[in-house]
């Protein structure tokens, strides 16, 4: 049947969506239809402990060729709460057996505090427990421009106290994970997994920046904050009361 469709000249949906050429032979990137793509992920241990509203917004506003992908997976409360309780009890037992001058002591103390915080938030504040995975996609027309943009993203993440890792030898899997198929590669998911509660997840909502972009507007310039075009149509009566809004 496939040969008949091919000989008959029929075009399927897969033919329209699939790229014409894919080069997977490089460690640092993948080339899809002559566009270079590279991917990074925020390590599971690489997040800030306390975050504010719009804490992912700087990555969304990173400029041309930078895209953000994040995945959330809600966990059942009846399974998570017992696990947190057991882990906290185990850490308390281990803490009694080590001296307070060892580095392990501070790590266990931090783990116990985190466990108690999560239990309190879930029991008293009715928050839900999620696993979050964050990937950053970078694209460019050349390998040199791609490397420049990757370096800029790494510098930006360092300023946000985020630890990012490149998906070396896994850019094909990362590219597949970036497609709207709700399928994250298990190896990347394992390295990028971070637990998060409802409030912090809501604060990750990235669309917090302002923009002015009328479809038939006149270009006034570029937004310095997120590199978006500033375009205003002063004669659009449905948006503005007077055409002399800008002089």
Each predicted region: which residue ranges?
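Extended, folded cores of ATP/NTP-driven motor/assembly subunits in large transport
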Residues: 1-209
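Glycine-rich phosphate-binding loop of nucleotide-binding enzymes
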Residues: 215-247
């Amino acid at each position: 049947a496939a040969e008949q469709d091919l000989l008959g000249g029929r075009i399927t949906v897969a033919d329209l969506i699939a790229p014409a050429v894919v080069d997977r032979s490089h460690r640092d990137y993948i080339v899809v239809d002559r566009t270079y793509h590279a991917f990074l992920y925020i390590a599971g241990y690489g997040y800030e402990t306390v975050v504010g509203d719009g804490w992912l917004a700087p990555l969304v506003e990173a400029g041309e060729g930078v895209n953000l992908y994040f995945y959330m997976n809600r966990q059942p409360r009846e399974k998570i709460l017992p696990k947190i309780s057991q882990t906290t009890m185990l850490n308390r037992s281990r803490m009694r057996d080590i001296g307070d001058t060892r580095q392990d002591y501070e790590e266990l103390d931090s783990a116990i505090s985190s466990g108690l915080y999560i239990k309190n938030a879930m029991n008293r504040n009715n928050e839900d427990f999620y696993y979050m995975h964050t990937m950053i996609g970078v694209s460019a027309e050349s390998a040199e421009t791609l490397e420049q943009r990757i370096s800029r993203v790494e510098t930006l993440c360092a300023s946000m106290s985020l630890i990012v890792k490149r998906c070396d030898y896994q850019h094909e899997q990362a590219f597949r994970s970036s497609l709207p198929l709700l399928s994250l590669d298990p190896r990347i998911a394992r390295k990028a997994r971070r637990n998060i509660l409802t409030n912090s997840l809501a604060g990750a909502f990235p669309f917090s920046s302002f923009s002015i972009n009328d479809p038939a507007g006149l270009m006034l310039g570029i937004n310095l904050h997120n590199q978006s075009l500033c375009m205003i149509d002063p004669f659009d009566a449905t948006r503005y009361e007077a055409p002399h809004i800008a002089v």
